[in-house]
Design a protein with these regions (language model features):
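Active-site mouth loops of central-metabolism enzymes
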Residues: 15-30, 74, 122-135
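Conserved N-terminal beta1-alpha1 strand-loop-helix module at the mouth
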Residues: 1-59
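Short, structured coil segments at secondary-structure junctions
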Residues: 39, 64, 80-81
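Hydrophobic faces of well-ordered beta-strands that scaffold small-molecule active sites
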Residues: 16-22, 41-45, 68-70, 85-87, ...
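Conserved anion-binding
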Residues: 77-135
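Alpha-helix-loop-beta-strand connector modules within alpha/beta enzyme cores
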Residues: 54-75, 105-118
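Generic secondary-structure signature for well-ordered alpha-helical cores
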Residues: 27, 65, 87-90
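Short, ordered loop/turn segments at secondary-structure junctions
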Residues: 47-50, 73-75, 90-91
């Protein structure tokens, strides 16, 4: 069953899922959590920097059978080692390149990798700190 189908199935049955977001750049924060990952239903992996996420995915794989889903902060955060990728569209982006450019650039690598792409739109609300999506 695909990751998305599993999420929908749980939703239809009113079963909650527990998902956590791991920032690969904050190894000191996520390493202590590894022994508890068996309690998690989904693990999102991603952050705001362009560092490789593959070392983090390798460590997570050794501690959980939960699907690993990339929550990309940018186009550098892609790995066919994950189970799925959130194909994100920032709906309140201020520049056109945030709306379409990453999608065009990554469409073929995602398709060729065979990784499950889960379409998702999101809106940033009142971010007090500057992030990778702001100028």
């Amino acid at each position: 069953m695909s990751v998305y189908s599993s999420i929908l199935s749980h939703h239809r049955q009113s079963f909650p899922l527990l998902a956590i977001l791991i920032d690969p750049d904050k190894e000191e924060a996520y390493l202590p959590l590894l022994p508890q990952l068996h309690q998690v239903d989904l693990v999102f992996v991603g952050g705001s920097t362009g560092n490789s996420i593959e070392p983090c995915i390798t460590k997570l794989r050794a501690h959980t059978n939960a699907p690993l889903v990339i929550f990309p902060g940018n186009i550098a955060q892609f790995s066919p080692m994950a189970d799925a990728l959130l194909f994100l569209t920032l709906l309140n982006a201020r520049t056109a390149d945030m709306l379409i450019e990453p999608h065009v650039h990554m469409a073929m690598p995602i398709l060729n990798s065979g990784i499950e792409a889960i379409p998702m739109g999101y809106i940033l609300i009142d971010g007090e700190r500057k992030s990778s999506v702001e100028i």
